[in-house]
Design a protein with these regions (language model features):
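Conserved catalytic or regulatory cores that recognize and/or transform ribose-phosphate-containing ligands
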Residues: 1-167
Length: 167
């Protein structure tokens, strides 16, 4: 059974009054098919007969305790067989740490990133502020890291959903 971990910045905060509505736009809600599944703590969600979504979930610890969130997500990354990363506007430090951990553990890593224009982020041919962790992941885990350039968030989501369906 494949086990999927989907990393990236959550596009909402539970302190916002409309966080439940905003959660519906998070790519993990689309992978799960229902934002309610993302907002509840669970060991996993069965996506099909060959694939479990094992995390992250938005509420992973009682009271949102930071140390418990980190240890929980590290455990999920250790357990997963496939790790998806959506890198868009800028990398959250937690997402970068998750990417490097998954790479060090030689997981099947799929990175979907939003490419900026040719005149932006010219330090790398990737044209993204996330170029350094992407290249580091490729160097650490070259046999198991795939990088997919996307024009925008919608294309990234389409590519992620296609990838998940292929598992």
């Amino acid at each position: 059974m494949n086990k999927l971990y989907c990393a990236g910045t959550f596009c909402f905060d539970f302190l916002d009054s409309n966080y439940r509505e905003m959660a519906k736009k998070d790519y993990r809600s689309l992978v799960l098919g229902d934002s309610a599944l993302l907002l509840q703590k669970s060991d996993y969600v069965l996506l099909n007969k060959k694939l479990k979504y094992i995390g992250p979930f938005y509420f992973e610890s009682e009271g949102m305790v930071d140390e418990l969130i980190v240890s929980s997500e590290v455990g999920m990354i250790r357990e997963c067989t496939h790790a998806v990363f959506l890198l868009d506007e800028g990398c959250c430090p937690g997402t970068i740490a998750e990417l490097i951990l998954a790479s060090e553990l030689k997981k099947n890593v799929q990175i979907f990133y939003i490419r900026r224009g040719d005149s932006e982020e010219t330090e790398s041919k990737l044209h993204t502020p996330c170029w350094f962790p992407i290249i580091m992941s490729q160097q650490i885990n070259h046999n198991n890291t795939k990088v997919v350039e996307c024009k925008n968030y919608e294309e990234a989501i389409d590519n992620i959903l296609s990838y998940v369906r292929s598992l």
